[in-house]
């Protein structure tokens, strides 16, 4: 889980390349154990907040994506230029109770 914030003026400019190029580029890396990515967005006062959720099967898979220190955030320079601030480190959690979609009950919208 990783948090970032930008201005209202930059929010669409930040989100658009994520949806059209960055997320596809991550998938094309064909990292063993990578299961997908989700992007959440909401207004947060004068800013727009984003939460990126990436799904991996193991810490080894996360390291294959991020490098030896799996908590260092991977933020492309072009994205950094559009952000007001962002977490320097990402947080990793184990899924303890899968969501309803994991049981096939609801589908997440395609990004």
List each language-model region with its residue ranges:
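Short, surface-exposed ligand-recognition loops at beta-strand->loop->(often short) alpha-helix junctions
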Residues: 5-18
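Residue-level signal for secondary-structure boundary sites
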Residues: 10, 60-62, 98
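Short, well-ordered beta-strand segments in beta-rich or mixed alpha/beta enzyme
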Residues: 1-5, 36-70
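An amphipathic, aromatic/His-enriched active-site/gating alpha helix that lines ligand/cofactor pockets
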Residues: 20-32, 55-92
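Glycine-rich beta-strand-turn "strand-cap" elements at beta-sheet edges
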Residues: 35-49, 74-111
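Short secondary-structure boundary micro-motifs
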Residues: 10-11, 21-26, 37-39, 48
């Amino acid at each position: 889980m990783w948090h970032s914030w930008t201005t209202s003026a930059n929010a669409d400019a930040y989100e658009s390349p994520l949806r059209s190029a960055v997320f596809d580029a991550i998938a094309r890396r064909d990292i063993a154990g990578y299961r997908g990515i989700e992007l959440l967005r909401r207004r947060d006062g004068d800013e727009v907040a984003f939460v990126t959720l990436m799904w991996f099967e193991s810490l080894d898979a996360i390291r294959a994506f991020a490098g030896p220190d799996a908590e260092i955030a991977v933020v492309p320079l072009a994205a950094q230029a559009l952000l007001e601030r962002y977490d320097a480190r990402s947080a990793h959690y184990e899924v303890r109770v899968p969501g309803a979609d994991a049981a096939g009950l609801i589908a997440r919208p395609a990004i």
